[in-house]
Amino acid sequence: MTQPAILVLEDGTVFEGESVGANGLSVGEVVFNTAMTGYQEVLTDPSYARQMVTLTYPHIGNTGFNDQDDEAKQVWAAGLIVRDVPRRPSSWRNQVALPAWLQTRGVVAISGIDTRKLTRLLREKGAQNGALMAGEIDVEKALEAARKFPGLKGMDLAKVVSTETTYQWQEGQLDLNANAFVQAELKFKVVAYDYGVKINILRMLAERGCDVTVVPARTPVAEVLAMQPDGVFLSNGPGDPEPCDYAISAIQELIAKKVPTFGICLGHQLLALAAGAKTVKMATGHHGANHPVQDLDGGRVMITSQNHGFAVDETTLPANVRVTHRSLFDGTNQGIALTDAPAFSFQGHPEASPGPRDVGPLFDRFVASMAEAKS
């Protein structure tokens, strides 16, 4: 027997549907993602902490879930909003259906609502705070919870989702034919600051010969330098980058020491802040796997995976920082490089998961910068 569910936005808009997850109440910022596939990766991406994800593609759950496609050890999204869930998933890799997977992990989710209407509302009004409620329904309680949510501006979530202990990562990409993970020869020592790192980012680094040491977000830079890394990686993550003063000061020290540094997503924003720029909260953010980005150095246009609600303000970039990539959707900054240090970053997700890997060569660029520094 299905349970009722509602989504209530802070402006008072109510969507009624049915529960396809756990019963309960969950609050967060409601955003929309335009990817047609990769819902498992989206739900387990730490960058979605405190966000409820609306998937615009109407049929979600077609291929079920498996043990190999998680991007973290737990679900970080605050909730899931979909139009329709197929009754029977179909994939040779499927191990469990969407409702059972969500219920086991305690994720509140709603289906049967007009996601096109919701997406238009979010596009026109911007991301909204909201509340998902399933099981026993109380609209007023849900509305009150939505309006009490403080929003992501000023919220440091990197320290919330980060690992609590240091660990090693040496596992490469999954070879589906062999049903095994690639093991490469490890030539470079990389320290990865975990602000909410995705597993497939670590796999992309390991596949290129990086022996990765993952450290908590607030690890003192002196400890990182004592490891004598060939390079430092600044990971993706959720929330507002500006409150992460511990990360900004650490990155400033890495820049001063000329340590090869590569940042993705939140790591990109933190590198910009460390260089002296500012960031801004976006109205709707970028969430999807079809975003065109131009490489300003070569003019090439690439289709990228994106997941961020904050952006670097290009007008505040200092003279020693050049713009390398720009969004062709809205002109926002997508990449920077320092002219006086071996440090660069990209706003989107070169590892995709889900999405295209047009920007994957940025990992090769990082490896090349470490090789040059060692020579």
From Swiss-Prot:
Pathway annotation: Amino-acid biosynthesis; L-arginine biosynthesis; carbamoyl phosphate from bicarbonate: step 1/1; Pyrimidine metabolism; UMP biosynthesis via de novo pathway; (S)-dihydroorotate from bicarbonate: step 1/3
Active site (catalytic residues): C265 (nucleophile), H349, E351
Alphabetized GO MF terms: ATP binding; carbamoyl-phosphate synthase (glutamine-hydrolyzing) activity; glutaminase activity
Record GO cellular component, one term: cytoplasm
One of the protein's GO biological processes: glutamine metabolic process
UniProt keyword list: Amino-acid biosynthesis, Arginine biosynthesis, ATP-binding, Glutamine amidotransferase, Ligase, Nucleotide-binding, Pyrimidine biosynthesis
Keyword Cell membrane among UniProt keywords: no
Enzyme class per UniProt: ligase
Domain of life: Bacteria
InterPro entries named in the record: Anth_synth/Amidotransfase, CarbamoylP_synth_ssu, CarbamoylP_synth_ssu_N, CarbP_synth_ssu_N_sf, Class_I_gatase-like, CPSase_GATase1, GATASE
Record Gene3D superfamilies: 3.40.50.880, Carbamoyl-phosphate synthase small subunit, N-terminal domain
Catalytic activity: hydrogencarbonate + L-glutamine + 2 ATP + H2O = carbamoyl phosphate + L-glutamate + 2 ADP + phosphate + 2 H(+)
Residues annotated as binding L-glutamine: S47, G237, G239, L266, Q269, N307, G309, F310
Region (CPSase): 1-185
UniProt family annotation: Belongs to the CarA family.
Subunit details: Composed of two chains; the small (or glutamine) chain promotes the hydrolysis of glutamine to ammonia, which is used by the large (or ammonia) chain to synthesize carbamoyl phosphate. Tetramer of heterodimers (alpha,beta)4.
Function: Small subunit of the glutamine-dependent carbamoyl phosphate synthetase (CPSase). CPSase catalyzes the formation of carbamoyl phosphate from the ammonia moiety of glutamine, carbonate, and phosphate donated by ATP, constituting the first step of 2 biosynthetic pathways, one leading to arginine and/or urea and the other to pyrimidine nucleotides. The small subunit (glutamine amidotransferase) binds and cleaves glutamine to supply the large subunit with the substrate ammonia.
Name of this chain's protein: Carbamoyl phosphate synthase small chain
